[in-house]
Every structure is written in structure tokens, then in C-alpha cells.
Swiss-Prot record:
Transmembrane segments: none annotated. It comes from Renibacterium salmoninarum (strain ATCC 33209 / DSM 20767 / JCM 11484 / NBRC 15589 / NCIMB 2235). Residues 43-111 form the KH type-2 domain. Belongs to the universal ribosomal protein uS3 family. Binds the lower part of the 30S subunit head. Binds mRNA in the 70S ribosome, positioning it for translation. Residues 230-262 have a biased composition (Basic and acidic residues). This is Small ribosomal subunit protein uS3. Residues 218-282 are annotated as: Disordered.
Amino acid sequence: MGQKVNPHGFRLGITTNHVSHWFADSNKAGQRYKDFVREDIKIRQLMSTGMERAGIAKVEIERTRDRVRVDIHTARPGIVIGRRGAEADRIRGELEKLTGKQVQLNILEVKNPEMEAQLVAQGIAEQLSSRVAFRRAMKKAMQSAQRAGAKGIRVQCSGRLGGAEMSRSEFYREGRVPLHTLRAQIDYGFFEAKTTFGRIGVKVWIYKGDVTAKELAQQAASAPSRGRAPRRDGDDRGPRRENSGPRRDGGNLRSQRNDRNENAAVEAAPAAAAVATEGSDA
């Protein structure tokens, strides 16, 4: 299962969190759940168009009744902000026009872009679009991630690799990438490279380590207890039953069986003695 499913969705609530924070409980047009989901998709599409070189790793959206907060995590904040904040003002104006609400735009810098799977996938895709050999681009990205502190990385490219007539998939892996371990912090990214031969999909998995024991203890403390409630009398298991009482079947079956065997032996003794006497007379 862990080999197929998206690592972010597989670990929601364990090592990853939602990137959209809002709650929809209205049936009014424009405030329904499907309206907010459609709006989130349009916001992320707006962030991706024309901002390919900004290195946007993640876009988080939070909603209140009359305001929308958008957090942009980028490796190159200067491109997103623009000269004297002109680009940021343009983005804020387009978002307010799209949502119809006041927009709070926060631009956050990614401290370690070599450890962000989405940024690594974008970097490989840019090299493939520039006609760099796919194996060289994959291995270079893996070496950079390991130098940055990654415990494991896997990179996969799918498409007409090298301009081949038949499409195929190739992947390389360094270190450990435990996709089945839920406590493992797996970062996942996907990006498409546009080449003259067609599109090449790039997938990146980066293993950053397990959740610490302190975090596990905090989660266990905050989780509700699922233990059995104590019994009404005695300890948790309650008092032991006494063996002296009558059984449900009316008595001890083993003692009844022994009594029947003894009675049968007493009744059979005279008959056996008579048979022995007749044999001696003959």
C-alpha cells in the first residue's frame, strides 16, 4: 500500500498536516465545501503559472469568515516579492479578485531547498527541459540532497527518456526510503518537464528521519484513552468465581461419570464370578 499511495495523504495526522485550513458548514452559493475546494485549486494554479522560476515548494491556505490567508513557501522570495513589492501587490490583487475577500499574503523562505522534494523535482525538470541527460540530472540531485542531510532519496523519471520511441520509467535510490513506515517523515514532490519529445514526469521521495520519541509521547498524551473501564466490584478483573457453586449443567459431570462407572463394575462382578465357576466345573 505504501508503495502506491501518495506519502502525504498516507501520513495525514501523523507526520504531515493539511495544506488547506478551513471549515465549510453553509449551503449558500460560494460558501459550500465544493466552492472552497474549487477556489483552492484556482489559487494554486495561479501561483504556478508564471512563477516557475520562483521555486514555490508549498502553498498553504487558511480561511476565516471575511478573510483568506495565503502562505507561499519559496526558495527565491525575491522573485515573488519583486522590485519594491510590485510582484507581491500584483499577486494579492489577483487573489482578491478571484476570492472576493480580503487576502493576507505571507511569503516565507525555504531554508534548505535541497531537502524539499517539490523543489528537487522542479530542478530536475528544468534540467531535462534544457536537454541535460536524465541520469546525470537525477544523480546530481540525489548527491545534493544527501549532502544536505537526507537519510534517503528516491528519484523516478517516466516518459520518452533520451528521446526513445517507447516510453519507460527509471528510478535511482540512495539510502533508506521506508514508504510503509507511518512514523517516517517522507517528503514527496512531482513535476512535469516539457521537452521536444513530450512530457517527462519526475517524482521525488526524500526520507528525513522518523518522528522523535518526544513527539510520539505528546501524541500519545493528547490521544483519548481506549482502555477498558474497571468492573463494578473488585479490581479490574473482578473477583474470581468460587468453584463450590453448582454448575450450569446441574452438577459436576466428571463425578457423575465416575459414579456410573463404579455402579457398572459392581453389577458386572457376580456375572463374571458365575462364568468362572461354570468353566471350572466343565
